[in-house]
């Protein structure tokens, strides 16, 4: 039967696999070993073995030892004696207490007193300022103290092209004085009837408290000299004391300071030549509030 023949062929022994391979492939190697898994690259040790290795490694290290100095014949302490007069440079650091008291007293006096202006700004009342300028041909416009210097501006009538404006100032109650030239300033608003000059004067330090600081202004043009001396009182810089609230007040021990304080002119109903709103202030006090016109300078 054909089926019996096929079964016999399948059950027959197959030829060995090495007959299909060349002799060079089988020489010197084991065919079965080629299909074995590779050995892992990481070597895993047991936990007990790692601990034993660390213990043996710690035993091999050198042990730390503490040795005292006396065991080697050395002293346990070191004593150094300082002489009281060994260093003479320390004597230079000694201060005399009396000198320190004088220094602190002068510093305290300097802190309590400062310099302030002994007059109000001339241009605060602009109409009165214009009247003085028309009358005297020269008038201080404004002034301020900047640290240790006096600065301000001056208005003069434009009489001639050639002008010379100077500040005459004294720091010792007119025992001596200095004339300082003022600098011309270009008129911003292009006024033709007046010119503006500026000045900056340094105040020397250590001025005695009893000496006065005063100045006035001279204006020379076409051989004529005009003066502005604050109506005979001169412009003064006085000393003041600081109060706890930070307000400047004149020193109480100066009796002559009252003569330099500004006295407000009593209000009257006189008509001035400019026809200003100040005239109607006496007749109709509420008139300025109607037109929202104030008494302060317009700038």
From Swiss-Prot:
Domain of life according to the entry: Eukaryota
Short sequence motif PP1-binding motif: positions: 65-68
Keywords, ordered alphabetically: Carbohydrate metabolism, Glycogen metabolism
Presence of the UniProt keyword Plastid in the record: no
GO CC annotations, alphabetized: protein phosphatase type 1 complex
GO molecular function term, any single one: glycogen binding
A GO biological process held by the record: glycogen biosynthetic process
Keyword Nucleotide-binding: no
UniProt domain CBM21: residue ranges: 130-238
InterPro entries: CBM21_dom, CBM21_dom_sf, Pase-1_reg-su_3B/C/D_met, PP1_3C, PP1_regulatory_subunit_3
Gene3D superfamilies for the chain: Carbohydrate binding type-21 domain
UniProt function note: Acts as a glycogen-targeting subunit for PP1 and regulates its activity. Activates glycogen synthase, reduces glycogen phosphorylase activity and limits glycogen breakdown.
Domain remark text: The N-terminal region is required for binding to PP1, the central region is required for binding to glycogen and the C-terminal region is required for binding to glycogen phosphorylase, glycogen synthase and phosphorylase kinase.
Quaternary assembly: Interacts with PPP1CC catalytic subunit of PP1 and associates with glycogen. Forms complexes with glycogen phosphorylase, glycogen synthase and phosphorylase kinase which is necessary for its regulation of PP1 activity.
Protein name: Protein phosphatase 1 regulatory subunit 3C
Source organism of this protein record: Xenopus laevis
